[in-house]
Amino acid sequence: MTVYHFVGIKGTGMSPLAQILHDNGYTVQGSDIEKFIFTQTALEKRNITILPFSAENIKPGMTVIAGNAFPDTHPEIEKAMSEGIPVIRYHKFLGDYMKKFTSVAVTGAHGKTSTTGLLAHVIQNAKPTSFLIGDGTGQGNENSEYFVFEACEYRRHFLSYQPDYAIMTNIDFDHPDYFSSIDDVFDAFQEMALQVNKGIIACGDDEHLPKIHANVPVVYYGTGEENDFQARNIVKSTEGTTFDVFVRNTFYDTFYIPAYGHHNVLNSLAVIALCHYEEIDSSIIKHALKSFGGVKRRFNEKQLGDQVLIDDYAHHPTEIKVTIEAARQKYPDREIVAVFQPHTFTRTQQFLDEFAESLSGADCVYLCDIFGSARENAGKLTIGDLQGKIHNAKLIEEDDTSVLKAHDKAVLIFMGAGDIQKYMRAYENVMA
C-alpha cells in the first residue's frame, strides 16, 4: 500500500485530511516548518510522523499530497515530479475522496469552521460520519455515510468539489490579494452552486445569496419572513441562546445553544435545515446542539485570575464585530478589551476603515504588528495607520504584555489569523 506524504501537513485542511486517511488505515506522514502550529497536536496524538522539509523525505512508492501554499518548485514537490512519484494537490485529492460518501460542503466568507464543526457534531449522532474541519480537526470512519467538510472560496479552490449538498453561510468581500470585488466573489459562489448535486442550504438574510441560481433546490434559512427555515422568538442570555424554528411558517421545535451572538443562531439554523432535509429526528438535533463544545480558535475561553481570556480567529471586520458582540452577550457587565493582530498587508489596507469601525465596539483596543502570510512579506502600510483611526488604541509587543494587567476583571479577546496566540501565551506567562 502507498505511503501518503503531505507537503505542508500542518495546514488547516492538510492536517485533518491526514488524520482521516490515518483513521481509515492508510500509512501517513508529512513535512512542514518546525515552528509549533496548533494543528499538529492531533497529528502527534495519532503518532503521525512530522518531518522538516527536505527533498530526502520523498521516496519511491509514495503518493505526495501537496498543500496549496507550496509551488511546484518546492524541493519535495520538484523531486517527486522528477522521479515520477504521483503529486496530487490537496483540493483535487479531497474532491475525489469525498465521492464515496454523501458529501456536505460548508462554505461562506464567515462561519465556515464553526458551522462545519457543529454539523459534524450533530450529524454523527445520527449516522456514521467523517469530517474535515478548518480548525485542524479531522476524523475518518470506514463505515461513514456522510462526509462533512469545510470548502474555502480562496483562489476558487472549492470548484474542485462536486458535493451532494452545500451550506452557504454568507458572501462577503475578503482575500483582496485574489478577489477583485464583491462581484468576483459572488461569481465564484455562483459557479460553485452549479456544481452541487442534491441541494443547497443558504442564508436568506444575506445580501447576496438570494441571487444564487442552481440546478438543485435552494432552501433558505434566517430570521426574515421569506425564509424556508426561520428562527423566531430569539432569547439571548448569559447562559446561551434559545430560539423557535418554523419550517415554511409551521412551528417545528425550540432549540437551545450554549453559544453567543446572532451569527451562532444562523449557523445552528443552517445545521437544523440540512438535518431536517436528511430526515434526522429533531430530538437528536436538539440534544447534539446542547452538547457542542465549539471548535478550535473560535471564542475559546479561559479564566486567568479575575480576567477572562478569549482566543479567536477573527481576522475580517465582520468577524471582529460579531465576536465582540458575543462577548458582550455573555459578559454584559465587564470591560471588553480587544487585542488584535491584522492578518496580511493586502487585507489590512483594503479594510482599514472597516477594521477601525469594528474594533471600536470594544472598550479598549491594543494592536499587534501586522502579520504577513506565506503569500506576502512586506507592505508600505504599518500598524500605525490603523492605530491612527481608532480612538486611544495602543500598540502592544510580545515582550511587554503586562499593560493588560491594568484591566481588572476584564474580558481580553485576542483576535487574528496569524500568530496572535503567542501574545496570549506571553501574557499568561507574565501572570504565572
Curated annotation (Swiss-Prot):
EC number: 6.3.2.8
Record flagged with keyword Repeat: no
Compartmental location: Cytoplasm
InterPro entries, A to Z: Mur-like_cat_sf (IPR036565), Mur_ligase_C (IPR004101), Mur_ligase_C_dom_sf (IPR036615), Mur_ligase_cen (IPR013221), Mur_ligase_N (IPR000713), MurCDEF_pg_biosynth (IPR050061), UDP-N-AcMur_Ala_ligase_MurC (IPR005758)
Record field: catalytic activity: UDP-N-acetyl-alpha-D-muramate + L-alanine + ATP = UDP-N-acetyl-alpha-D-muramoyl-L-alanine + ADP + phosphate + H(+)
GO cellular component, one term: cytoplasm
A single GO molecular function term of this UniProt record: UDP-N-acetylmuramate-L-alanine ligase activity
Pathway annotation: Cell wall biogenesis; peptidoglycan biosynthesis
Positions contributing to ATP binding: G108, A109, H110, G111, K112, T113, S114
Any single biological process term in GO: cell wall organization
Record's keyword terms, sorted: ATP-binding, Cell cycle, Cell division, Cell shape, Cell wall biogenesis/degradation, Cytoplasm, Ligase, Nucleotide-binding, Peptidoglycan synthesis
Main location class: cytoplasm
Name used for this protein in its record: UDP-N-acetylmuramate--L-alanine ligase
Organism: Bacillus subtilis (strain 168)
